[in-house]
């Protein structure tokens, strides 16, 4: 479950890192805050569990994600570093472990789509959104 949740977070973070105007960019900017809208074809669900993920990509290459699943009473905070090379987003958690996958990034307007390089590919869609203070305040470490 942690790997699945980490994958969802990474995708969310990837989406958060790209910013754009109203058109798609070849190498979008990821910096900013994002909130997950959907994962693959399930509406923000992993299996039967509802998932809520906020991602914050800082211009200095650091990220923070806040994840909550149906079985969690609160958000869990993850942090680390990210990089974008030739339109591919990858990263590492603060504990030194790599994200479960790298992601191709597409941003159109206020929507970011992350597609994993894993098979089968997971597609996560994020909308630009400020992370609520309540989410940040209640988040605990993994």
Provide a role label for each language-model segment:
Residues 18-79, 85-142:
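Lipid interaction determinants
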Residues 1-21:
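Sec-dependent bacterial lipoprotein signal peptides
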């Amino acid at each position: 479950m942690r790997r699945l949740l980490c994958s969802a977070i990474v995708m969310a973070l990837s989406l958060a890192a790209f910013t754009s105007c109203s058109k798609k960019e070849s190498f979008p900017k990821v910096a900013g805050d994002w909130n997950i809208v959907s994962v693959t074809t399930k509406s923000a669900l992993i299996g039967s569990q509802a998932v809520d993920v906020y991602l914050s990509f800082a211009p200095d290459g650091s990220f923070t994600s806040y994840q909550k699943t149906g079985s969690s009473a609160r958000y869990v905070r993850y942090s680390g570093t990210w990089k974008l090379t030739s339109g591919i987003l990858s990263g590492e958690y603060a504990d030194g472990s790599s994200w479960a996958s790298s992601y191709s990034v597409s941003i159109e307007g206020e929507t970011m789509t992350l597609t994993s390089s894993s098979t089968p590919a997971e597609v996560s869609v994020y909308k630009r959104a400020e992370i609520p203070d309540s989410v940040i305040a209640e988040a605990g470490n993994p």
